[in-house]
C-alpha cells in the first residue's frame, strides 16, 4: 500500500500560543489591541473592565481607555486561517491510509482498551489480547476525543478560575494599598492627639512652675525691700545715738528716758519664713505617672475592636472600629474570613482562658445578635456557605449546635422577642434590652447575658467553648431614617497602686 500524499506541517506550538487570548485561553474572537500593544478578545477585556475601578490592561496593568480599542484585523485573519487549516488537516488525517502493523504488516484497525495498544486482526488473535476488550480505531478515537474535549473544558474552566483568583488578588493588593494609606493617616492622627495632650500638659506644668517662681521672687523682693528700709532706719538711729553720746552729761541724761523708749521700739530682725524655695518635688515627683494618670481621663478604651475584615458586605464599620451600621449590600474585596450571606461580623480578640466581659449598645435595632462563636465553627460555616452558593443562607448554620452562642432580637407575627441561639428555649423577656453585658468564664464554661440598664440576668449558656470570638449580627433598620449603629461600650479604666515588694 502506497502512502498517501504528504501533509504539510501545521503551525508550530509557540505560534498557536500567540493566537490565544490571555484571559479566556481560547483563540481570539473579535481580537482588539490596547494602547500598550497587548491583544484580547473584545468580550474578555470588556468583562475585565466591568469589575475594575480604573480600566487597565489585564497583562501589564497600564491604564487603558475603553474608547481606544482597535480591531486587529490581521490577528483575526490569522486565527481564521489557523482554524481552517487545522480543520482541513483533521479531515485529511481521517482519509489517510492506516499504518501497517510492525509484526504482521497488516493494517492497524483495532485498539486494545486494556493494554491501550493499536492492533491488527492478527494481533487480536494473539494470546496476549484474547480476553481483552477491543474496538475499531475510529470508535475508540471518537470516544477518546470526547474525553479529551471534556478534559479541555475542565482545564479551560480551571484556567478561568486561576484568572478570576488572580483578579481577586489584584483587588486585595489595591485594597491593602488604600488601607495602608488610611491606616497611616489614622495612626498619625492618634499619635498627634497624644502629642497635643502632652504638649498641653507640659506647657501647663511649666506655666505653673514659672508662676510659683514669679510669686516667690516677688516675695523675696518685698522682704529685701523691707529689710533695706529697716536697715536704713537703724543706720539713722545709730548716727543719732552717736551724736547724743557726744553731748554733755546733763543733756545726755535728760534724754535718757526718751532714748530708751525709742531704742526699745526698734524692729527686731524676723526669722526666715518656710516655703521660700522652689518646690521641686511638686513638679518632678512621679511626673510621668501623674501625666499618664491624667491622660486616662481622655483616652478611650474598649475590650476589643470590630474586625472589618470579617464584616459582610451589608455592614460598614466606623473608623474607630467600635461601631457598625447596616447600610445595604455593597461589594467588598474577597476574604475567606468575611461573612458572605448574612450581615455578621466578629470581634478582634480570641478568648480561650480567663474571665472576660464587655457591653454592647444595641439601641432600638429591629434585629440583632450578640454572643460568641467558636473559631473553628466560623471557618466551617464559611466553607458550607461557599459550597451553598449565592442563594444559600449562611445564617442557617448559626445556632448552638454548630458553635454559635448568642442572644438575639427576632421579629414574629405577635411582636418582637428576645431569644437565644438554642432553639429549644422559650422567649426570655417581654421588655427588649437596649444595652447588654456579656460575661465569659472560659474555665467555668459559662456565657452569661445581663440587661445593663435594668440590672437583671437574662440567660446563661453552659458549654465547653474552646477558642471563641465575639459575634454580632446586625439587621437592616426600619423606616427611611439613617441606620442605627451597634456599639461596643467603652471601658471604665481604674488604677490600682501597690508597693513593689
From Swiss-Prot:
It comes from the Eukaryota. InterPro entries: B30.2/SPRY, B30.2/SPRY_sf, Butyrophylin_SPRY, ConA-like_dom_sf, PRY, SPRY_dom, TRIM/RBCC, Znf-RING_euk. GO terms for molecular function: transferase activity; zinc ion binding. The modification Phosphoserine is found at residue 8. Pathway: Protein modification; protein ubiquitination. Widely expressed. Highly expressed in brain, heart, kidney, spleen, skeletal muscle, lung and thymus. Lower expression found in stomach, large intestine and bone marrow. A zinc finger (RING-type) spans 21-61. The keyword Signal does not apply. Belongs to the TRIM/RBCC family. This is E3 ubiquitin-protein ligase TRIM35. The lineage of its organism: Eukaryota, Metazoa, Chordata, Craniata, Vertebrata. The gene is Trim35.
Amino acid at each position: 500500500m502506497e502512502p498517501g500524499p504528504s501533509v504539510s506541517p501545521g503551525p508550530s506550538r509557540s505560534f498557536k500560543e500567540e493566537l490565544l487570548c490571555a484571559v479566556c485561553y481560547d483563540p481570539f474572537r473579535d481580537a482588539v489591541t490596547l494602547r500598550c500593544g497587548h491583544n484580547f478578545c473584545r468580550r474578555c477585556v470588556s468583562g475585565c473592565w466591568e469589575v475594575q475601578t480604573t480600566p487597565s490592561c489585564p497583562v501589564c496593568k497600564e491604564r487603558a481607555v475603553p474608547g481606544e480599542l482597535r480591531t486587529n484585523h490581521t490577528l483575526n485573519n490569522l486565527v481564521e486561517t489557523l482554524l481552517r487549516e487545522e480543520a482541513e488537516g483533521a479531515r485529511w488525517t481521517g482519509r489517510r491510509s492506516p499504518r501497517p502493523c510492525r509484526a504482521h504488516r497488516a493494517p492497524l484497525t483495532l485498539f486494545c482498551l486494556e493494554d491501550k495498544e493499536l492492533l491488527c486482526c492478527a494481533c487480536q488473535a494473539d494470546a496476549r489480547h484474547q480476553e481483552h476488550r477491543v474496538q475499531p480505531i475510529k470508535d475508540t478515537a471518537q470516544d477518546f476525543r470526547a474525553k479529551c474535549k471534556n478534559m479541555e473544558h475542565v482545564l479551560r474552566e480551571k484556567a478561568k478560575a486561576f484568572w478570576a483568583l488572580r483578579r481577586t488578588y489584584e483587588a486585595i493588593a489595591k485594597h491593602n494599598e488604600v488601607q495602608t494609606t488610611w491606616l497611616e493617616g489614622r495612626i498619625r492622627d492618634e499619635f498627634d492627639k497624644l502629642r497635643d495632650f502632652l504638649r498641653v500638659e507640659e506647657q501647663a506644668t511649666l506655666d505653673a512652675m514659672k508662676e510659683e517662681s514669679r510669686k516667690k521672687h516677688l516675695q523675696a523682693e518685698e522682704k529685701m525691700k523691707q529689710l533695706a528700709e529697716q536697715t536704713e532706719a537703724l543706720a539713722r538711729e545709730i548716727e543719732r545715738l552717736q551724736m547724743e553720746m557726744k553731748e554733755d552729761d546733763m543733756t545726755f541724761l535728760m534724754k535718757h528716758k526718751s532714748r530708751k523708749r525709742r531704742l526699745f521700739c526698734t524692729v527686731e530682725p524676723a526669722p526666715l519664713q518656710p516655703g521660700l524655695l522652689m518646690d521641686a518635688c511638686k513638679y518632678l515627683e512621679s511626673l510621668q505617672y501623674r501625666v499618664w494618670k491624667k491622660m486616662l481621663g481622655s483616652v478611650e478604651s474598649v475590650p476589643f475592636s470590630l474586625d472589618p475584615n470579617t464584616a459582610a458586605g451589608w455592614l460598614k464599620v466606623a473608623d474607630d472600629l467600635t461601631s457598625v451600621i447596616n447600610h445595604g449590600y455593597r461589594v467588598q474585596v474577597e476574604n475567606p474570613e468575611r461573612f458572605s450571606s448574612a450581615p455578621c461580623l466578629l470581634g478582634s480578640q480570641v478568648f480561650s482562658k480567663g474571665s472576660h466581659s464587655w457591653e454592647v449598645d444595641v439601641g432600638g435595632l429591629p434585629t440583632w445578635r450578640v454572643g460568641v462563636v467558636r473559631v473553628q465553627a466560623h471557618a466551617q460555616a464559611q466553607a458550607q456557605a461557599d459550597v451553598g452558593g449565592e442563594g444559600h443562607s449562611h445564617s442557617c448554620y448559626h445556632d448552638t449546635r454548630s458553635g454559635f452562642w448568642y442572644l438575639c432580637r427576632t421579629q414574629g407575627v405577635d411582636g418582637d422577642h428576645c431569644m437565644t441561639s438554642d432553639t429549644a428555649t422559650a422567649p426570655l423577656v417581654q421588655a427588649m434590652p437596649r444595652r447588654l453585658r456579656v460575661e465569659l468564664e472560659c474555665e467555668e464554661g459559662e456565657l452569661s447575658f445581663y440587661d445593663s440598664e435594668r440590672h437583671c440576668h437574662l440567660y446563661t449558656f453552659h458549654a465547653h467553648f474552646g477558642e471563641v470570638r465575639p459575634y454580632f449580627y446586625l439587621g437592616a433598620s426600619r423606616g427611611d431614617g439613617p441606620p442605627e449603629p451597634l456599639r461596643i461600650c467603652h471601658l471604665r479604666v481604674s488604677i490600682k497602686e501597690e508597693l513593689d515588694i
